[in-house]
């Protein structure tokens, strides 16, 4: 099966109320995730490494330049599709002041995690959001 690398950016903020907020935007292309709320990102081109791709994609999709030095790679999440395996390279970025008008913040609580957004976000993003919440929550309680 063909491997298709994709780099995504998660802008997040951890609130004093022990809640996580992640920034998403509505997908407008005609692909399988049309109309869903998704993280900025896209395919890694042949001449790029995933970090370069995520910086380029954020610029293309959101119109802001992010400092690659602020990125933290969270992990790689495989997603099986009918004709390929998508490898999601997930990069975390701190909140950026220019995001507020170009998308929306989703609030994630410990009791439900990403479950309230079922049908509103792509399936693979549930695992990513839930893992991110657990990681940040555990770091706050060490």
Go through the PLM ranges and name each one.
Residues 1-22, 92:
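Conserved N-terminal beta-strand and adjoining loop/helix that marks the start
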Residues 13, 68, 93-97, 110, ...:
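Non-catalytic surface loops within mature trypsin-like serine protease
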Residues 14-21, 32-33, 82-84, 99:
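Short, solvent-exposed loop/turn segments that connect beta-strands within catalytic domains
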Residues 19-60:
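Conserved Nudix-box catalytic region and its N-terminal flanking loop in Nudix hydrolases
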């Amino acid at each position: 099966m063909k491997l298709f690398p994709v780099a995504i950016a998660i802008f997040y903020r951890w609130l004093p109320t022990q809640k996580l907020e992640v920034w998403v935007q509505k997908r407008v292309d005609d692909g399988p995730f049309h109309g869903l709320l998704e993280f900025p990102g896209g395919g890694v081109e042949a001449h790029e490494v995933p970090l370069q791709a995520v910086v380029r994609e954020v610029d293309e999709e959101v119109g802001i330049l992010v400092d690659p030095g602020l990125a933290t790679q969270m992990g790689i999440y495989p997603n099986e599709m009918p004709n390929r395996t998508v490898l999601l390279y997930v990069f975390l970025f701190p909140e950026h002041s220019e995001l507020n008008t170009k998308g929306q913040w989703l609030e994630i609580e410990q009791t439900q995690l990403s479950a309230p957004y079922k049908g509103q976000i792509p399936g693979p993003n549930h695992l990513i959001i839930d893992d991110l919440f657990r990681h940040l929550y555990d770091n706050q309680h060490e």
